[in-house]
Amino acid sequence: MQITKNDTVISLNLTEAFNRYVLSYTATTPLRCTLTYAEQGHERVEEFFLEAGEDMTFASYMDGYLRHMVADAALSMTARTITHEACEFTLHSFTVETVPVLAEKTFYFENERYRVGVELCWGGGLSYLEDKKCPVEGLVNILNNFDTGRLIQQSYYGTGDPPYVRGEFMGNSWVYNPVQGGDRGNHKSKLIDARVSENEVYVKCRPRDWGHDGGTTYSYMENWYRLDGDYLVVDNRFVDFSGWNHPKNGQEVPAFYTVSYLNNYYWYDGDQPWSDGELSVKSDLPFWPDDWPYCTFKPKAGNTETWSAFVDDGGYGLGLFTPNIGHTIAGRHMYDGSKDPHAASCNYIAPLKAVKLQCYKPVTYSYLITAGQLEEIRARFKARKDDITNTAWDNY
């Protein structure tokens, strides 16, 4: 069938109870869709987006999945084009099912080294990382999770021009900023889907727009989390369906928050990467917006050793390595040395890559995380420095 700017209604009439639906389809252009369903005597409608492609699959939980909501029947769906092109669309199948709720809030997975928490109610960002070999008494969760902005999570920056309506944060006008966890008002992003296998946790969400207090974005974020010995490996994917023209911006890849206790920031500032040269350290980092130059770390030409870490005075801490970046911003907010993951104080790292978001075209990248003594962190990243390249950015 041909889909245009006008809604095309497709009757479903599936009368079995469900909290998850799955489409198999082929579409020549992206589509904006709705699902109408019955729930406790009421008709409800929720929105979803389909990427263009052949023999594609889209799966989504119902809006109330984490609250154990179950719909009574799938009545119909609508589809319309987002771009100016008509779409040739084939719905191969539309199925519904009732699946268990993985967790109402945090889903945990672990190996012999780490226990990791995925915050399902906050878009599937990482809210918990416990190192089972941590030598520091009282340090359990190394990550800060004070609010929806404080996770290890995806965060992107786009347009500030009409028709987009700017938001506001800390007294500043704020551009389009899809954030995995939610928005500045602590509204939660919607969990779209999640899957758990023996070695991997997959999550997908529809993020909020950070500068707005409520509302959502026309975008999806996906993560694949894998524990591999002493490493946490994270793959990321983002697709924007807004149709807006975005300028090039420094994208946080990812936004990364630890507890305040890890007070020393280490990085390699030389020009002979992976040669075990002397590391640089700053132990007095301020809140990053208060002094951008002091909190900005630009690698020298040819330096591919772009990991960094926050560690305590004994050298223990947490490191992050995102290859093929432009520079890194790091800082400490309300530094007080707290080990409390819920504290207002925190440390922050954001490797930045200058990328112009292109609607309907996926952004993909990966990074590594490891905990331990500083020399162990460095050695582990060196051992796997060629495993991730993030060269997809170069052709985006």
Predicted regions and their residues:
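Beta-strand-rich recognition/accessory modules
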Residues: 102-114, 121, 298-396
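Extracellular carbohydrate recognition and processing domains
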Residues: 40-71
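Extended, loop-rich substrate-binding clefts of extracytoplasmic carbohydrate-active enzymes
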Residues: 161-229, 243-247
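Beta-strand-rich N-terminal accessory domains
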Residues: 99-166, 371, 378-392
